[in-house]
């Protein structure tokens, strides 16, 4: 899910994620989570997503985690997050910040989900673990790998004219990407003051791309604009380039309307990350069968 999942809603931080963890607890599962930026692990897009790995309380993996936490307490939970848990072997960490939270979400702390929803508020961090209704969360620092720059996914063949910005459109794009401090009008006639900072225009091709949204390719502030490597003219990304940013093969979405190709990639996960997790789950499943 999106990275803000662990913080929502704004007026009761952590409530929604607490509900998710409590539901897993009631279903007999432990949960480890990590907020991962794909660019930190060598990908071409700064795409942050919250990944949850749940494991049932009748597995050897659960018993190992529960035993360690029972003996070592929060130090044991910390060890699992930084070294021995689900994510650390495939997405290693450099360390952690001195920010953490811990507590209980079980029936002794909250009678039921209604009770939890009304009262629970907590600051969850980018790494965390919930076992037997007890959670521990810490702000982790990723061990950063060399990233792929945006220029590495750009097509170098001649492209259709529809991807290029016309001279008449440049000023409008500059406005969309630029800083704003202006009075705007609501539908009911009232006014409000709108402010936002500037964005790079065009996008820097020596850095990973920003997070793609489902509106990628449309005329919007969030759409990437690059200097074409062949002509140096400004243009938007092509569907193939969007597929590459997520680690899909070229033309993976071919055959659907172009608008939906952009929409699909704006909703997608970064494939190499999911592939690494799939291999990790497969290895843990084999270990479970041998235990």
Model-derived regions: residue spans:
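Class I S-adenosyl-L-methionine
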Residues: 1-199
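C-terminal target-recognition/interaction regions appended to catalytic cores
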Residues: 123-291
């Amino acid at each position: 899910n999106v990275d803000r999942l662990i913080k929502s809603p704004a007026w009761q931080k952590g409530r929604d994620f607490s509900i998710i963890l409590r539901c897993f607890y009631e279903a007999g599962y432990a949960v480890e989570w990590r907020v991962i930026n794909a660019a930190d692990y060598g990908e071409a897009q700064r795409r942050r997503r919250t990944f949850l790995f749940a494991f049932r309380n009748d597995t050897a993996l659960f018993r190992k985690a529960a035993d360690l936490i029972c003996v070592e307490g929060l130090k044991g939970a910390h060890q699992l997050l930084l070294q021995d848990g689900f994510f650390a072997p495939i997405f290693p960490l450099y360390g952690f910040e001195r920010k953490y939270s811990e507590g209980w979400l079980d029936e002794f702390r909250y009678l039921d989900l209604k009770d939890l929803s009304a009262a629970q508020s907590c600051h969850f961090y980018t790494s965390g673990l919930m076992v037997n209704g007890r959670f521990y969360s810490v702000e982790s620092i990723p061990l950063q790998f060399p990233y792929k720059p945006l220029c590495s996914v750009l097509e170098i063949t001649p492209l259709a004219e529809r991807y290029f910005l016309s001279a008449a459109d440049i000023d409008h794009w500059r406005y969309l990407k630029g800083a704003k401090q202006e009075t705007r009008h609501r539908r009911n006639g009232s006014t409000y003051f709108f402010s936002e900072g500037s964005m790079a225009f065009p996008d820097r091709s020596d850095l990973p791309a920003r997070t793609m949204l489902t509106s990628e390719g449309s005329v919007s502030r969030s759409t990437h604009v690059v200097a074409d490597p062949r002509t140096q003219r400004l243009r938007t990304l092509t569907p193939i380039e969007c597929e590459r940013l997520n680690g899909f093969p070229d033309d993976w979405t071919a055959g659907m309307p172009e608008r939906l190709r952009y929409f699909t990639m704006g909703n997608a996960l970064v494939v190499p990350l999911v592939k690494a997790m799939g291999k990790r789950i497969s290895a843990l499943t084999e270990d479970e069968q041998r235990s």
